[in-house]
């Protein structure tokens, strides 16, 4: 994570890392990084909970624009200025992955299906519904603040953005794959579809 933070520091002044109950020494590494705020969950609550904690804290600190990115090194921090620049006149910016050659066929199909499913339910033509590299205004966050605790958070954001008719743009991003592809599991995909249907029906 240190290399990720070193890269982010070149493009952002205020950095928040949420340690979601990890036991691999991540928190100790982050504490040694100057200019980085560390938030910790005592136990693992899931990605949705971790990102929500970070966003809540940022908004309370007076942030106007929030940029979300994963800490595993797959997101290139050099894209941060592009996200901020693209925020002009819109509420949310979604990044979509252009390089998916290392993604197994099953995951490619799953992403395509979720994209079509999202369009059918909410009318949103989001090219990468599970991409985690995104940005939004603090006002937009207050409207789309999600309840999901895990990977379905990305799709809930889209659902709420459609519900509130928020303006959005999409920009292509290159994903840096360091190891075998890791993504949303098949079981997570089914859970996401179920949650999407409930959001659409207002359940």
Which stretches of residues belong to each language-model region?
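Short, well-formed alpha-helical segments that are part of the catalytic scaffolds
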Residues: 1-11
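Catalytic donor-sugar/metal-binding loop of nucleotide-sugar-dependent glycosyltransferases
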Residues: 125, 149, 158-176
């Amino acid at each position: 994570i240190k290399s990720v933070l070193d890269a982010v520091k070149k493009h952002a002044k205020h950095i928040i890392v949420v340690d979601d109950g990890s036991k691999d020494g991540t928190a100790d590494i982050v504490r040694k990084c100057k200019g980085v705020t560390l938030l910790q969950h005592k136990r693992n609550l899931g990605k949705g909970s971790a990102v929500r904690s970070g966003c809540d804290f940022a908004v309370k600190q007076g942030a106007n624009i929030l940029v979300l990115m994963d800490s595993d090194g797959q997101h290139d921090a050099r894209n941060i200025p592009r996200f901020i620049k693209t925020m002009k006149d819109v509420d949310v910016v979604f990044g979509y992955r252009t390089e998916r050659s290392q993604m197994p066929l099953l995951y490619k199909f799953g992403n395509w299906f979720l994209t079509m499913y999202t369009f059918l339910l909410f009318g949103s033509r989001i090219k990468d519904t599970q991409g985690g590299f995104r940005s939004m205004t603090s006002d937009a966050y207050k409207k789309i603040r999600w309840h999901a605790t895990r990977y379905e958070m990305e799709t809930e954001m889209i659902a709420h953005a459609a519900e509130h008719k928020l303006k959005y743009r999409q920009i292509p991003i290159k994903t840096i794959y360091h190891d075998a592809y890791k993504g949303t599991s098949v079981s997570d995909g089914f859970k996401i579809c179920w949650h999407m249907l409930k959001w659409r029906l207002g359940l």
